[in-house]
Amino acid sequence: MADLPESAQVVVIGGGVVGASVLYHLTKAGWTDAILLERRELTAGSTWHAAGGMHTLNGDPNVAALQRYTVQLYEDLEKESGVSCGVHLTGEVMLADDADRMDWLRMAHARGRYLGMETELISVAEAAEKIPFLVEEHFVGALWDPVGGHVDPSGVTHAYATAARMAGAQVHRNTWAHDVVQRPDGLWDVVTERGTITCEHFVNCGGLWAREVGRMCGIELPILAMEHMYLLTEEIPEIRPWLDATGGYGIGAVDFGGEIYTRAEAGGLLLGTYEQACVPWSERETPWDFGSQLLAPDLERLAPSLAVAFEHFPIYADAGIRQVINGPFTFAPDGNPVIGPVRGQRGHWVACGVMAGLSQGGGVGLSMANWMTSGDPGFDVWGMDVARFGDWTTPSYTRAKVMENYSRRFSISFPNEELPAARPLHTSPIYDRLDDANAVWGSSYGLETALWFQQDGAEPIEDVTYHRSNAFDVVAEEVHAVRTGVGLIETTGFAKHQFTGPGARALLDRVLANRIPAPGRMALAPMLNHDGKLIGDFTVATLADPFDGAETFLVLGSGVAEGYHERWFREQIASHLADGGGCDGDVNYRPLGTELAGLSIAGPKARDVLAAVASPTSPSSGGTGSDVSTDAFAFRDIQRMDLGMVPAIVGRITFTGDLGYECWVPTSLQQRLFDLLMEAGEPYGIRLFGLRALDSMRFDKGFGGWASEFRPIYTPAESGLDSFVALTSSDGSDRNFIGRDAAAAARAAGPERRLCTFTLDDGGTPTGNSDDGTTESGTASDVLGDEPIWHGGEVVGWATSGGYAHWSQASCAMGYVPAAAADPATPPDAFEIEVLGVRRPATRRDEPLFDPTGIRMRG
């Protein structure tokens, strides 16, 4: 056994397929002073007993892109390492047994267009030609993926490790990392029974033991292992002709309705399922002496799935069972991997919860290596970033959500579906009031948020669908109430970041791409990474203490990105101080979370409501008192103001694109403010509205949103935010914010693509040019996001979000297309957007549908 080095640039803990992939990709990126530590043998844990299935399809196109990379990598990996990965690209048939699942397949097929995937919608008869032992009457259609197949999990892992060793990395087996400690100088000591390695970075790829490794560093990762079973049949002579005709390996199939997957294996068949009666494994901690063991099978749990298999694939009914494999795999609450840097612990990285390691491991490894070596993952990994989870993901929460996710692994996720497990968790003080108003609830970053308000006497439930739901007419009423009078929405779910201290303005001037406003003003401010890509869109507000003039900065942004942005802010504060930008105490940063509650009123009568509750204020408060006229309280002003007896921070801004105000108060005072505003608004017909109506109104204005239009793969010039990027200070000197040079270069070169708003036909008259010859999916439906945009008979872009703009009475979409197609000189009506498999005519809108001059918002 080779001696253990005393130091390394990076240590990877865990020798499963993910750890080996991270090591391999680090060496490809030039970090060869890298060590992988494996407690036992490579693949011990989950990898060794995996079924080895791989495919490129995923509900998140960004994850699908990484899966495609993984599958494409295997051929080169075999050549590079000399180790066989056991790749069998048999192709895979995805089967739908009802209209909803067929809609999902249409969406998956359409999304694959702009990713370059070669899927094909096929009939049931065509599916039966590929899987001759299925019963056609149980299905309505299918999707053919020629790239699906399976690999040898052990071969893949050893190929990664071998190639990494050939590049200079080290792999140490039978070396247990039983402690990880951060030193005062910021380096990490990885303590093993064979010695201690000091490193700059370490990566937790612990798999089944990732929780234990995280706890060594004081964090609780939101992952849990679940028992997962699949069975192998005896040889089945009847399938021999099929095997011979397909090169000996058959063709894989996924039966979404039956919640089963199947493929050929050793002259027989393999059948796996994600059963409803799922069972967590080792809930509190994973035993360190667990290794290459299997768990006791429980066929009774599989009985419902087997009954479906016998009906849909009768050949299983007479097949003998050779072996039942039951082994643990780790899952995150939403089923996606958990990767990236750990907030507040520089040099600590995680790559765990990758339950589909043979499909996703390569992409995860590449993203991690890019991130660690260059500061950016190189892909849009928002859906996998560890920062998407906050401190609210306790072990009990994780258990409930993981079990829910596992049991729904092959279930359809509808775009308007809100899953009930572990809810409600966090609620605001007015939760009961909104609930009494018949709110239909969603959840965002652990907080319950009102989506819309059902009519009195009706159940507050939204029908899940890919089409327009029972919320449609009610949301229209909410929008009408706002546009013609006044509405109130809770905004507690927005992220609130507070900065104080003598160095706070200088820090924000470096972190945000727009100029920091003067006291009493607000500004829209993108945040960029070093490559000039968008990593945040904020409203930054400056408040000055009326006595000593000390400034407080509120940076308001997307609630779901609170942890993501907190991590970046803390990293930049540390870098700012290290670069001589001040000393400890010069910048005080605090994410306010639910300490500060929010209510927003919007609509042409919003000023009247605010005037009715605004109290005369002493000059020492710095506010204008009860004068809320445009002259005294202009667009993007912010001030401290007493609303009745409630001291509040009020900003004149709203995401509705209308006249409006955001009111921020301590959480303990939210109920009183809510009652006050509702009472004052009664003469004006004030109505509660939710996020569905807010979304509808943003389409009126063409406002983009975080995680849809604004993501780390776009630049300000592409996304329409370039006007909020200030390259110079007010005195004309160059600013020095992060990403400035890249943003300046992008502005000079001009964007290659642009964000546009489109309107589509009414959604009830499909054109009939769907791939599978049907038209029913086009009825009463809107763009959801990730649909391909056609121009000139080719796919040129993709939709980022969509819905119905009720005030403008238009089905809308936002999306990115080449700059030439976005040019006003290009005919605006030459587009199509593929909605549920139907290409619908779309018109580019170069001006907002509502209030194009902004007079309602600014007046």
What residue spans do the PLM features occupy?
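Flavin-dependent oxidoreductases
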Residues: S21, D179-L295, P304-H312, S396-E418, ...
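Glycine-rich FAD pyrophosphate-binding loop
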Residues: T27-W48
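Flavin (FAD/FMN) cofactor-binding and adjacent substrate-gating region
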Residues: D76, E80, D97-A167, H172-R173, ...
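Beta1/beta-strand and adjacent pyrophosphate-binding region of the FAD-binding site
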Residues: L4-V18, I35
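C-terminal catalytic lobe of FAD-dependent flavoproteins
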Residues: G257, W288-L425
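Conserved, structured C-terminal
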Residues: P415-G442, T449-L451, H467, L543-A550, ...
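Acidic, proline/glycine-enriched N-terminal capping motif
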Residues: R388-L528, K533
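Dinucleotide-binding Rossmann-like beta1-alpha1 core, especially the glycine-rich loop
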Residues: G52-K130, G257-T262, G268, A296, ...
